[in-house]
Amino acid sequence: MEVILLSKIKKLGDSGAVINVKSGYARNFLIPKGKAILANKKNIESFEAQRIALEKEKINELLIAQSRAEKLKKINSITILSKVGKEGKIFGSVGVRNIIKEIILLGIKINKKEIRLPNGLLRQVGEHIVVFQPHSKVSINFIVKIIAKN
């Protein structure tokens, strides 16, 4: 029985794929759970129209993410002041929230999920590399400088 997948399913295919599965699997699992629809002419045509709209939306999201990444790339680095104890250790740590606060002050809106700290929380004075990933295909590194506050 041919069905159109509505969502990505492991070992079967991606969303929008027309696949052939056993009729019992389609009737008892895929279709009732909303993971697939029957692949007749009407459904294929309507899904093609939806797929084209989704692809345009994905391309638009990618372009927006690239423009946001370019804005942050122009800034290249941000500076955060923090109280420091002996040996250059910070009281507490600098996390994603602190970094987002500084970036928002520069006029770029970002989400907490878009910042990655490769080495965990920042606990030392100095320069640290942080990853900004607004989209799965767009990722840039920028520098966070932590300076001692007197």
From Swiss-Prot:
Keywords attached to this entry: Ribonucleoprotein, Ribosomal protein, RNA-binding, rRNA-binding
GO molecular function list: rRNA binding; structural constituent of ribosome
Origin superkingdom: Bacteria
GO cellular component, one term: ribonucleoprotein complex
Biological processes, Gene Ontology terms: translation
Family: Belongs to the bacterial ribosomal protein bL9 family.
Biological role: Binds to the 23S rRNA.
HAMAP family found in the cross-reference section: Ribosomal_bL9
UniProt protein name: Large ribosomal subunit protein bL9
